Amino acid sequence: MKKQSNAPQIRFQNFEDEWVNQRLGKTVEVIMGQSPDGKNYTDNPNDYILVQGNADMQNGRVVPRVWTTQITKLAEKGDLILSVRAPVGDIGTTDYPIVLGRGVAAIRGNDFLFYLLSRMKQTNYWAKFSTGSTFESINSNDIKSAEICLPSQDEEAAIGSLFRTLDDLLSSYKDNLTNYQSLKATMLSNMFPKVGQTVPEIRLDGFEGEWEKVKLKDVTESIEYGLNASAKEFDGENKYIRITDIDDVSRKFKEDSLTSPDINVSECDTYLLCEKDILFARTGASVGKTYLYDKKDGKVYFAGFLIRARIKDKFDSKFIFQNTLTDRFTQYVKVTSQRSGQPGVNGKEYGEYELYLPKYEEQQAIGTYFSNLDNLINSYQEKISQLEILKKKLLQDMFI
């Protein structure tokens, strides 16, 4: 098939007609918002839902937050809701009849148009209308005169259905991720002893007996500071981990911008991480952030604002690491890190952290339980990331 001048790069089979140029206002009805008087705002869910801007939308849906007794401009269930004030172009749909505030407009469109408007946001289409303005906004004429390209109704339906399926799958993955993250938070709270307790509230089957109180220094071979070297471009083998390279949520080594230590690494074996090593951030806003070395991360040297605790063989490093994610540890860091300048915890202070240990077999079981839970969480995070990349690519290539 010959290349067409007015067709997207990616199309479903059996669709060959060129797309038609059109103005948005000639295609659908656009309703600009008008805010009610502030005195008529309420928190009563029996009143009319008021949508004023993107703060009233989450994940592409209107989420009731404010109500009003005064009707100004109305949107119907199923309408598309476009943010017309900073940030301009955010788009959502409403599952309810709503009152439109002046920060939004309603568009009577379908799934295809929803994703077309999503692409326009992605490509900064609306930015040209706010150039030179101190307050980013678009008006009725900007919206109605927006230039769009439309396929046949059948192709619109096919494209809209594809993206709706993608979004439903994304929503499902995000729900699962949230559920597993909530489960982990609950288990961290209940599978380690709380303050004043010597056993946890929840234990795995087959284990009993008191846990022993120890200090972090009792379970480590050494507690050492990192390498005093700047970072350079990644050499393909020797990785350099700094505080910012530890993901705040997953506590995994982020490899999106790898670097190497700017030093002769043949003389730096002391700073090379190995299994059972746990890193602790020692200063700044990230103090207390931890990372458990994973051999899959390869050859990794650790930087000077990190402290390494090398766990003794007779203790389970996964169990010790999960201890550093508990409220007890967070509270210890909060109290200990108080300084006249920026917060910090040194190696000796980390070594004084008190924790409770069960027998080795139970340590292993708990460490494995949380490791498996982390793997589930990471798998959903990866699926979400991959789907979002795919969606962004398809938005770019399936529209004009």
What are these regions (language model features)?
Residues 1-16, 175-209, 382-400:
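Short amphipathic coiled-coil heptad-repeat segments
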Residues 2, 25-150, 217-357:
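DNA target-recognition domains and sequence-specific DNA-contacting regions of bacterial/archaeal
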Residues 9, 128, 145, 172, ...:
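The feature marks the first
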Residues 11-34, 203-225:
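Non-catalytic DNA-recognition/assembly elements of restriction-modification systems
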Residues 12-13, 159-171, 192, 204, ...:
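Hydrophobic structural patches
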Residues 22, 187, 198, 287, ...:
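Short, charge-patterned binding micro-sites
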